[in-house]
Amino acid sequence: MKKIKLRDYNSNMGIFIDVNYNDSKIVDNSLHIQYDNLLINHKELIDKSKKYYIYCNGGVKSRKVVSMLEFYGYDVTLVEK
């Protein structure tokens, strides 16, 4: 599992997805896709040809999402606080 710190992310790296249930904007121009919605509907919501950076406040949900999306062949990186 690839990981980076939140402070090291910049928008040129790829698409930032916040999987928290609240709609707070941690990063400008980020996507907010709730955890369960992304797990169930990833084929409709994201594109395998793009690079994604997955974040949540606690880290548990984002870690699960990254593991699952890696399994399905997505280019994802876990973003930690």
Model-derived segments and spans:
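Conserved beta-strand segments of alpha/beta enzyme cores
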Residues: I15, N29-L31, D75-L78
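Glycine-rich nucleotide phosphate-binding loop and flanking beta-alpha elements
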Residues: D23-V27, L39, V60-S62
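Catalytic cysteine-centered active loop of the rhodanese-like fold, especially the PTP/DSP P-loop
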Residues: H42-K81
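A short alpha/beta connector and helix-capping loop motif
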Residues: V27-L38, Y53
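Flexible, polar/low-complexity N-terminal or interdomain linker segments that lie immediately upstream
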Residues: M1-V27, Y35
